Amino acid sequence: MLIVADENIPLLDSFFGDIGEIRRVNGRTLTPDQVKDADILLVRSVTRVDRQLLEGTRVRFVGTATIGTDHIDQTWLQEQGIGFAAAPGCNAVSVAEYVLSVLSLYAEKRGIEDWSSLTVGIVGVGNVGGELARMLERLDFTVKLCDPPRQEAEEERAEEFVPLAEALECDVVTLHTPLTRTGDHPTNRMIAGSELAALGQDQLLINAGRGEVIDGEALLARLQQADAPTVVLDVWEHEPRINPDLLDRVWLATPHIAGYSLEGKMQGTEMIYQALCRYLGLPVRKKAGQFLPEPALSKVSFTSSADEDEAVQVALRACYDPRRDDARLRLTMRGNPEERAQAFDRLRRDYPVRRECSSLKVQLKGSSKSIQDSFRAIGFKLKI
């Protein structure tokens, strides 16, 4: 059995080596000729999987190690009887921790002592948005949820959701929707001229969902105005050919890596491995946890005199500080458009190991229950 797999999916040999022969490929440039004799295709979000790629091939199962599926023509796969699986929620914790780190930096930038005084509007409350909401609420943030499809589908919970206009009134607006172009609530360019005009200079806009959810040209125009909001982008229109003018205008810019924790990537591999085993009728014998290495940083300590918010934010940034990825991206965005695109992909391919907060043991000496609860809300392991 031949498995053609994106070379950037981790632990391919560990999970799939005893199922079939593995052929590693560049997912961005994958061609029909490279998959014509494959039985299994494993991809990430950079590969468009449709009739053009797979017609006439032997492929009978497609797995994407991502939460998003807008790069997969699921209707065509179903018509052809080709099995399919994604990895919903695999990196939800990673993205939520990314947003929390951004919030900690934003509070510092604005001189806000109590970061939980910020109101946060979450647009898109699926696996990622839901995980973020749970963390924020445990940290005593005021959170407003906007998800029209869920609001309509879940009548018993309809009152928990607010319209987009109300979410846009929050101090922080963070986007976590899938990319959809049809239906009653398409998200393609959902945030455009009028929505951006509603955001002022005392607000923060974060996009760690899909680049095309924001109209890039409208955003660039808005950022050239004196009263523009502060903007953080992890995802971009037209990746990997991102707009360098937009890059220059945003506060923090990262190369689509919010979900790139080691745990998140390994869970993505594990989920498509499990789905393939079910498809083939094989027993599931492996779990991501058995392959996790010891973290480079395993412990931090705080005394009883530590300020609660400051201690939590120090530990959070010890695990992940987005300023490092921002600096790397800006340094590589030189040269012609093709060179910049290659640099963007290279940053993602060669991304350094990043661990989630659950990998870090926090020692608290003489601490209050309040600070213990705050650390637990984010997933840290406590030693009291």
From Swiss-Prot:
It comes from the Bacteria. Substrate binds at S45, T66, Y260. It catalyses: 4-phospho-D-erythronate + NAD(+) = (R)-3-hydroxy-2-oxo-4-phosphooxybutanoate + NADH + H(+). One of its GO terms (molecular function) is protein dimerization activity. The active site is at R210, E239, H256. Pathway: Cofactor biosynthesis; pyridoxine 5'-phosphate biosynthesis; pyridoxine 5'-phosphate from D-erythrose 4-phosphate: step 2/5. GO terms for cellular component: cytosol. NAD(+) binds at D147, T177, D234, G259. Keywords: Cytoplasm, NAD, Oxidoreductase, Pyridoxine biosynthesis. The keyword NAD applies. InterPro entries: D-isomer_2_OHA_DH_cat_dom (IPR006139), D-isomer_DH_CS1 (IPR029752), D-isomer_DH_NAD-bd (IPR006140), Erythronate-4-P_DHase (IPR020921), Erythronate-4-P_DHase_dimer (IPR024531), NAD(P)-bd_dom_sf (IPR036291), PdxB_dimer_sf (IPR038251). It is found in: Cytoplasm. Its EC number is 1.1.1.290. One of its GO terms (biological process) is pyridoxine biosynthetic process. NCBIfam families: PRK00257.1. Belongs to the D-isomer specific 2-hydroxyacid dehydrogenase family. PdxB subfamily. Catalyzes the oxidation of erythronate-4-phosphate to 3-hydroxy-2-oxo-4-phosphonooxybutanoate. Homodimer. This is Erythronate-4-phosphate dehydrogenase. The lineage of its organism: Bacteria, Pseudomonadati, Pseudomonadota, Gammaproteobacteria, Pseudomonadales.
